[in-house]
A protein has these predicted regions:
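Structural motif
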Residues: 48, 52, 123-124, 157, ...
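Beta/alpha (TIM)-barrel catalytic core signal, keyed to glycine-rich beta->alpha loops juxtaposed to Asp/Glu
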Residues: 2, 6, 137-322, 326, ...
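A short, structured active-site edge motif that brings together acidic residues
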Residues: 82-95, 190
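N-terminal binding-site loop/beta-alpha segment at the start of enzyme catalytic domains
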Residues: 1-85, 345
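Short, well-ordered amphipathic alpha-helical segments that serve as non-catalytic structural scaffolds
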Residues: 45, 110-121, 262
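Active-site groove signature of glycoside hydrolases
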Residues: 121-140
Length: 345
């Protein structure tokens, strides 16, 4: 049975399927943004996403128990597997140090790729993963070697499309020369437009040249564009945003100025500032798909409804001017390296 609601769709890459124009980033269901809910609470969020037609789901083996959660949900609703376009990722490793802090590393080797994919299939209770990303590129494995292994997994029917997260234009070109890449995933929001510029290796232009779809993670600036947060004290104690430079006591008040301008325009349009931010990302091209995340149904519904917010040419230009003039303070804190290059072959 298909979902009761159908969202507008966007085509994946040159020859891929049509998938919902707004996706669902699932990291927050399990890690990073405070305490995760019970399985039952999170199942209700997944149920609602399906009901709304938001069936383009993005997870990772790095996201705590999220792959397991999806597997449990599919066991409850096996008839819904074909409705979901399911993306996952591999390569980020986490270890807990003696002092309780976390140590992050990256392993995008062929061996890591295959082992992670096999485990993800088991955890998610699926026969194939629709889109499988290299979550980050390590500093020792030539990306050609990883792509060769991903190509084998595709031939074996274990994955259908290949993606890369936070890669440089050079790495994307090298990967694409081995096998077509369907998607790249980077942070893209009114706070961060590096993908458009030399600071982001002009990745957007490269992706468009090659026919690669861009999935925009954190399209709401990790929730800040909603206007819900005014200081880092508004975050839960276990929320990782407390440690990000953009949200410290010095930078946060400066960065909220852009949010306030979005709120003013959104009020005039009769939508929320978060919906306006998503509408702006959607307006940047049919090859861009935002994947906002949330662990609450009301925000999921709000995000999905952004597909109904249309911008006039003048409004899009006004927003572009606001974004260009914003002068965001502080790094986005991509500890594993944004727009990463690959080791030489």
């Amino acid at each position: 049975m298909a979902p009761p609601n159908k969202l507008p769709t966007r085509k994946l890459a040159k020859n891929g399927p049509e998938i919902s124009a707004v996706g669902f980033g699932m990291m927050g269901l399990s890690i990073a943004y405070g305490v995760a809910g019970s399985d039952e609470e999170r199942f209700r969020v997944l149920d609602r996403a399906w009901e709304l037609g938001c069936t383009n789901w993005d997870t990772s083996d790095f996201y705590g128990d999220c792959e397991d959660l999806i597997g449990k949900w599919f066991k409850l609703h096996p008839e819904r597997r074909d409705d979901i376009f399911l993306a996952s990722k591999f390569a980020i490793k986490v270890a807990v140090k003696k002092d309780g802090s976390y140590d992050f590393s990256v392993d995008s080797s062929p061996e890591s790729c295959r082992a992670a994919c096999e485990l993800a299939l088991q955890r998610m209770n699926v026969d194939s993963i629709d889109l499988y990303y290299i979550h980050r590129i390590d500093k020792v494995t030539p990306i050609e070697k990883t792509m060769e292994e991903l190509s084998k997994l595709k031939i074996e029917g274990k994955i259908k499309y290949i993606g890369i997260s936070e890669c440089s234009s050079s790495a994307l070109r090298r990967a694409y020369a081995v096998h077509p890449v369907a998607a790249v995933q980077v942070e893209y929001n009114p706070w961060d437009i590096d993908i458009e510029n030399e600071s982001g290796t002009d990745l957007l232009a490269t992706a468009r040249e090659l026919g690669v779809t861009v999935f925009a993670y954190s399209p709401l600036g990790r929730g800040i564009m909603t206007g819900k947060y005014k200081s880092k004290d508004d975050f839960e104690p276990a929320d990782t945003r407390r440690f990000y430079p953009r949200y410290n006591d010095e930078n946060f008040p400066k960065n909220l100025k852009l949010v306030e301008r979005f709120q003013e325009m959104a009020a005039r349009k009769g939508c929320t500032s978060g919906q306006l931010a998503l509408a702006w990302i959607l307006a940047q091209g049919d090859d861009i798909i935002p994947i906002p995340g949330t662990k609450k149904i009301k925000y999921l519904e709000e995000n999905v409804a952004a597909v109904n917010v249309t911008l006039t040419k003048e409004e899009e230009q006004d927003i572009r001017k606001m974004v260009n003039e914003a002068g965001i303070a502080g790094d986005r804190f991509e500890r594993l390296g944004p727009y990463s290059d690959s080791a030489p072959l």
